[in-house]
Amino acid sequence: MTKSHVIFSASIALFLLLSISHFPGALSQSNKDCQSKSNYSCIDKNKALDLKLLSIFSILITSLIGVCLPFFARSIPAFQPEKSHFLIVKSFASGIILSTGFMHVLPDSFEMLSSPCLNDNPWHKFPFAGFVAMMSAVFTLMVDSITTSVFTKSGRKDLRADVASVETPDQEIGHVQVHGHVHSHTLPHNLHGENDKELGSYLQLLRYRILAIVLELGIVVQSIVIGLSVGDTNNTCTIKGLVAALCFHQMFEGMGLGGCILQAEYGWVKKAVMAFFFAVTTPFGVVLGMALSKTYKENSPESLITVGLLNASSAGLLIYMALVDLLAADFMGQKMQRSIKLQLKSYAAVLLGAGGMSVMAKWA
């Protein structure tokens, strides 16, 4: 399922870049530079190529370190899901993901879709970036909600079957209400606690697995777009700062994703597949940008619209996941609610992560 999502998102990005050649009202006739590459003073094609090759390996390595660190550091309290330190580290990573959506991806989308290279009608008449980001967040909520509902019904059926095998068929199972947490009511006799706890654990694990898959999907789309921008440009001044910022970004975003994958309790094969696709998507985007450098022009209307819309959809997904499924779920959880001190530490971690990534917006 994860592999197909990644291939699907990569295929969409490539398909749009290659096939979308004419949008209604895309080209502003007054701007003659829209079909050409940007003209900067520090353009050096040969040096840029060396920096791009270096960026592929450096981003790949830092991404692998970030996403795999939670898997192999279980002896460290900060990477043990049952420990309070894990919530603090996860809050830091969630702040990075939140800032990525608000400070990096969404502003780029607004800038691209309001470019003078696009005609006033319709691109300057309507805030497409905000609209697409909003619809992306709503769509993510819909997928999140419907998927959880489907699997919750399946879990209830399994629970009824377990109870029926022990109790009489006419005995009812207590109502289970799911909204971030599981609230138990009445179950017959000695099965009350055991079965309700089992269903609660099942639903919580389900939430973690949905979270891990949807979060990875959003990160993959965003990473391909970022990689495209690195692979396409020959501006050495831009690449240097961008690569350094991306290494920092990928490592800590990988830690956030790795923590979610760890909580999902996948087998080692699926963990390896998800970590691999996270690590290779940005380098893949760089290679794709290099391959399309002759046809992909960052200021062309086709590229501005395609990348702008992809950025907007990715931003909506990342913002939703960071606020709803990561931060809200943890801060409203029992462990956080029982400790004001832990909440304050976690808020500080969120601000530190979001603040650090906001500063990185100067270069990336």
Swiss-Prot record:
| Bilayer-spanning residue ranges | 53-73, 86-106, 126-146, 210-230, 242-262, 272-292, 304-324, 344-364
Q: What is this protein called?
A: Probable zinc transporter 10
Signal peptide span: 1-28
Question: Keyword annotations for this protein?
Answer: Cell membrane, Ion transport, Membrane, Signal, Transmembrane, Transmembrane helix, Transport, Zinc, Zinc transport
Matching entries from InterPro entries are given as:
ZIP, Zn/Fe_permease_fun/pln
Question: How does this chain sit within the bilayer?
Answer: Multi-pass membrane protein
Report the principal subcellular site: membrane
Its biological purpose: Probably mediates zinc uptake from the rhizosphere.
Instruction: Cite the ranges annotated as topological domain Cytoplasmic.
Output: 74-85, 147-209, 263-271, 325-343
Q: Name one GO cellular component term.
A: plasma membrane
Quote the subcellular location field of this record: Cell membrane
Instruction: Provide Extracellular-side residue ranges.
Output: 29-52, 107-125, 231-241, 293-303
Q: What's a single GO MF annotation on this record?
A: zinc ion transmembrane transporter activity
Gene it is expressed from? ZIP10
Database matches in Pfam families: Zip
